[in-house]
UniProtKB/Swiss-Prot annotation:
Name by which UniProt lists this protein: Zinc finger protein-like 1 homolog
ZnF start-end (B box-type): 1-43
ZnF RING-type: positions: 53-101
Gene Ontology terms, MF aspect: zinc ion binding
Organism of this sequence: Aedes aegypti
Amino acid sequence: MGLCKCPKRQVTTQFCFEHRVNVCENCMVVNHTKCTVQSYIQWLKDSDFDSSCPLCGSPLDNEDCVRLICYHVFHWKCLNAKQQSLPANTAPGGHTCPTCSDPIFPPVNLVSPVADVLRTRLGQVNWARNVLELPLLSEDKPDYYTTATTSAGVHNGNTFASSMSQTRSNERPESPHSIVNMESYVSNASPALDFHASSRRPLLARESPIGASDRDDNKYKRRTPQEIFSRWSRRLYAPSSKPPWRRTWFLVLGGCIGFVCIIYVLATLGRRGGDGEVGLIYNRNLPHEE
């Protein structure tokens, strides 16, 4: 179990074999759409992976892919063709993953980003709509995501171009040979620039937290005793936001405990040495045989 590095910082047990990082389901549908993702325990047992489609054998990056709820990835075209070859009266349990034989259709009560994307993709083909008891489409839409992405890009490009043209039309027309006194302009603008620059400065300089360099990248690295000692020493003597009297009382208490331990050790050693010397003294009052 680990922590995903996305802004949501969710705890997850899934691990990306290609990038070797913990990933949550939000990252699977956004940043790791074609990566091999399984549990971290599975990666510890066998870290080898194949970045090709199990159905056709070609690389996953060549075509559009889909991830099932078991996290196995296939080419959408290959998976669609395989499921279309099944009889029309196939039960929902008959549509299974070609790798692990888990059901393709996510349960109704399953709420996850991977399941939502899979439901959207399955709702665009007739064989899945037939199983889900939905009205059939006139024709399947295998290139829905590609078309939607392209149209969105064209729309954004047109919007950006129109906004740029409107901005340019609102600009003041300049003469071809205008002269600007840069010295006076800089001198007049420098107070405002200094004010804005100073406003961005933090009131209190915040230092990096202790152990900031020791993050998720090397949290599984085996540390030497020297590194452990240096880390705890920096934690003790580094400036912190806690009240100073806590640090003082901590040092005083630690010194008292150390002094008591030293006295106890010296007393124990002295008692042992004294017992040995007393045993060598000859007592004349005791009866003894001549």
